[in-house]
């Protein structure tokens, strides 16, 4: 598999340090608020990476942390009249609920910052002993950025350029404006722990270094997160970890791109902030997951309701095709004969193309394109009355459904029972568009009655009235069926 390594700025052949085993760490949430679609994208991207690596036979140990002590958590605790621990527990619980709905697998290890204070203090002590960090009279501990010659290698930033814009805030006791906090002295009303420098709490960056060292062998095979974490968080992780250990921290750095909303940066000030729960009030979770896979993970993705509607339509088309294949396989009598050779060759080519897309830096957008081509191929056989009843077609239909199981295993979509999913999808669309199903059924019955009375003008008028509601009616051998346009 080829993976783009942020550190080297190129795609590289992925090969774990220990053959057959992968250790992977991804930065999790700071638990102070509901998760937004940026969190959803990062979670889905790395969920697919874990799924795919396991699909190829690799034994993956996946760790994703929770930051449960932080300035933002303390601020939220004061706003809500809760303790910091209560705030963290509240939003970790909502995180799990959101991820379960998006079919994101639980990580194997989910360390929390507050249960690793001892490890963080130990890392600070090692850095101070090596003169890579220093404690201030006030009880803060800072990392000496200039003591680490490789600072900036991940983000491509130059230390001297950073220095020109850096300032020391009033009250700080930094030796250099570039230095960053490893440990923060306690302030009134904030949670704290005892340390060699007095009561205090960890800085943000030290948390991931300490937790990854505690739970996984270093160097990590993969360390991931959103593009926004490249600097300063991941740059600082590298500096403090490699300075303390004297060896490489991570072999492959993987970062997902930003989520924009209507081509603008998502922010509360712009009024375009979208939580996962906001979106799932109007769309099924699988629609959001599917949408997040329609762009390459390193590219920005633009969230719009139009793009969600398009994702919904495409998801519907695939499930409809899978449903038809399941129904066709209920046939009891099949005629002998294979399918044309070009059909089987095209199918095998598409299977390989799907795998090749995933091997090429996890290109889910291209992989989904091959899924659609395979669905069109299946529909072509279903539409051919001569071919669809053959033994060759039966084997082909089964092979497509087997391949759909692979899509689900790797992408985490297309795994529902088609009829159930389509019914839930219709109910979701009906609710979103404010359609009254009882009214539709009433009109359909009136249309049936008009046709029975041979009042075809009335029947056509009712059909137009139904269409004006945003409803499509299809007449089938078993009766009229309707769906949302």
Curated annotation (Swiss-Prot):
Zn(2+) binds at residues 27, 208, 233, 237. Its cofactor is Zn(2+). It catalyses: tRNA(Cys) + L-cysteine + ATP = L-cysteinyl-tRNA(Cys) + AMP + diphosphate. InterPro entries: Cys-tRNA-ligase, Cys-tRNA-synt_Ia_DALR, Cys-tRNA/MSH_ligase, CysS_C, Rossmann-like_a/b/a_fold, tRNA-synt_1_cat_dom, tRNAsynth_Ia_anticodon-bd. The keyword Nucleotide-binding applies. It is found in: Cytoplasm. ATP binds at residue 268. It comes from the Bacteria. Monomer. NCBIfam families: cysS. HAMAP family: Cys_tRNA_synth (MF_00041). This is Cysteine--tRNA ligase. The lineage of its organism: Bacteria, Pseudomonadati, Thermodesulfobacteriota, Desulfovibrionia, Desulfovibrionales.
